[in-house]
């Protein structure tokens, strides 16, 4: 499971 920022690539 990846945090929401990982989906948009804005971590």
Curated annotation (Swiss-Prot):
Record-annotated disulphide pairs? 5-11
Q: Which GO terms describe its biological process?
A: defense response; positive regulation of leukocyte proliferation
Specify whether Cell wall biogenesis/degradation is a keyword of the entry.
Answer: no
| Subcellular location per the Swiss-Prot or TrEMBL entry | Secreted
The secretion signal range is none
Q: Does the keyword Secreted apply?
A: yes
Could you tell me in which tissues this protein is expressed? Expressed by the skin glands.
| Gene Ontology cellular-component terms listed | extracellular region
Keywords annotated in UniProt: Amphibian defense peptide, Disulfide bond, Secreted
Q: Looking at the record's lineage, which domain of life comes first?
A: Eukaryota
Q: What does this protein do?
A: Induces mouse splenocyte proliferation through binding to CCK-BR.
Q: What is this protein called?
A: Riparin-1.2
